[in-house]
Amino acid sequence: MKKWAIGFAVLGGFVGANAVTWNPVCETNGHTLVLSSDHFEICRKAKYDDGSTNNVGVSRDEAQKGLDILESVFVFYHDSLQWMLPQPGDPDNKLKVAVYVFDDEKMGALYGGDNTEACNEAGCSPGIWLGKGSLSDRSGLAHEYAHGMQSLTGWMGNNSHTGWVCESHANWMMHQFIPNEAPGCSEYLIDFPFLYYGSTRDRYCNWHFMEHLKEEFGGGIEGVKEVNRIWTESIKDGEAGRMEQTPFSAMMMVYDWTLDSLNQQFGKFAMKQATLEYTPAKKKLYKKAWGDYEFSTRRSVGVGYPYSNHARITMMNKIPCPDQAPGEGVEEECPDQYITPSYWAPQRWGYNLVRIYPDKAGKVTVKFRGIVQDKPTVKGYTCFGDNEDDYLGKKYKWCNYAPDALPDPASGWTVGLVAEGSDGTPRYSEMKHGKGFNLEIETKDNDKALWLAVTATPTEMQTIMWDQFYYSIYRYPYMIEVVNGTPEGYNKDFWKPANTSGYKQHSNGGGWVSNKASVASTVFVGPNAVVNGGTLTGKARIEDFAVVDGGTVSGNAVLRGRAFMSAGSVSDDAVLEEDAWLVSGSISGNAKVGALSVIFESTIKDDAEVYGVMWPLEYKTISGTAQLRGDLENNFSKEISKGIFYGMVDDGMLNNANYGANLTTPPTEATASLDLARWYAVADDSTDLDSSTTAIGLLQQVRPMGTSEPKLYFDKKEQAVFIRYKKNGREFRYRVTGRKN
């Protein structure tokens, strides 16, 4: 795949740190100087912002430790990386960076940003504010000083567009400073890769794409310098266009990229994520820090945040065969085709990894069909936002939560296959961009895994704002068909217990039931369902690929889809469905839990519903008619009994109509329903006939709906003549002559 050729420019405005005079700030502004170094001052203000007295005591050793860390950060950021110095407008005289120290009880965290008191103007000097315990926090100081430097560029734009990148980039800079550590939350992007890139939900933890760009630009110090150009060479404070600037438009401007160039980079990034294909040292570090993609890992406590690994790899849903049309000859089965669950489909520049299990070594072909959405489902929503700007005489009010207008979806995907060799080295297929196409790759008997990497790459820029509600953001679902392979979950005996000793097939449904479980004869256990433990009574139903490891299921409760139950209880008429997981707690009444929800020590009852795609719901009670949906960040402590909430939810939102407190039905989603999705032919189909097949008449490209003209062909392997045609977007073939094996 093509590597982007980018010239390495020396950053404008950089002057060696030792060539200038660094002047004090702390005592000049009436504060108490604790200790000073070449470029920093540990400073104690007399009062907190609330007017109370700041009595913090800082020993010389504590202050010196903080200064030593900060000076090492300074040398790395400025001397090694040549990031611009503070007060970029004055190359000869600089101000020391003030580090304001407070008592830990009043300020337990660290903050970095613009210190306007240093030079009586914004964008002049960085500052750091912290509790004294943070003076020894190496990673925290590196992160906050990066914020201080970002402030000198005007934060790249307004918070609605760029707030997330400030946190992401600061953690990435911290990672450059401490390269043998992966910042603590960095597995979040691995856990929830389908969220749009730049999501507010994982803003501290989604810096992986910057590491990818660093390596695209040659790696090492030069690669870091190239990434930092988006801060130093993008539209500056005071220049026209800054309010509309996003980190992505900045990249396109600085690197002279088109949207297609950016889309290709995100496609390459997703393929790289399949094997974490960074430099050898980073690959080893990341695999140790983030764990693997195995199904057993995803259904365990996992790594990082507990029970958050289960959504890493997308599992497809099989498309039911349509009603077969009458015709002469022997009717053949319809092709095995699969569709993404809507909740698992990637948002803009999010990606899915789908594991493919080859039937045998050799060529595997994946037929990819994006589900094209031509227009929004709604024109927009009632504008709701909390960010405003006044810039160059113009006032900006951002609808950052609920946009009042939606762009066209501009459906597009960038897709590739990655075969992971026996030694972990990847082999890549061609990477394709568009709506529908076929991909192929050669596999080997000793390959570790085969991955399909699907990135949502719309053909028009999609700008998503800070905390924008989940329902207003497009997802980009798709369908696949695999030749010589099967998506995970549909390969032979995937759900069957590895050792059926101690199991029997249940009399009511035929599913596998362990002798460690107690299952009443009135309970239905479907043929693909498994009960490894627990007590199941009444008219409960365990359907599809649902698995019960423990707990109690009673009444008319239903588990279906790929629902997983470790413990707890599901009772009455409650439903656990789709890819939801009950780790512990209870679901009762008419409650429903689905999508990618994880329930841990929580109570879901009455008519409540939880359909989340992100964080586990822990120690919560959801009752009445309340609903939680989408990219949940559950920061509330009170019981919720009404309303429908998305995204970050805290106690202050529970009675606020703007956040959903008065909703009784979910808002219309921007993403169209999958009900009308139909398979369709593409130009690649005419070149994908098996070598044992001789074409007599090739299928023409057909509309997604309707029936194509029948064509005859002779299959050498089958020694038979078939009629092939398309109906309702699906392919059918009928045997006219020859043997039937």
Language-model features, listed with the residues they occupy:
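Predominantly polar beta-repeat domains that present long G/T/S/D/N-rich surfaces used to bind, process
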Residues: 556, 562-564, 575, 579, ...
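Short, surface-exposed terminal/edge motifs of secreted or surface/virion proteins that either
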Residues: 713, 717-737
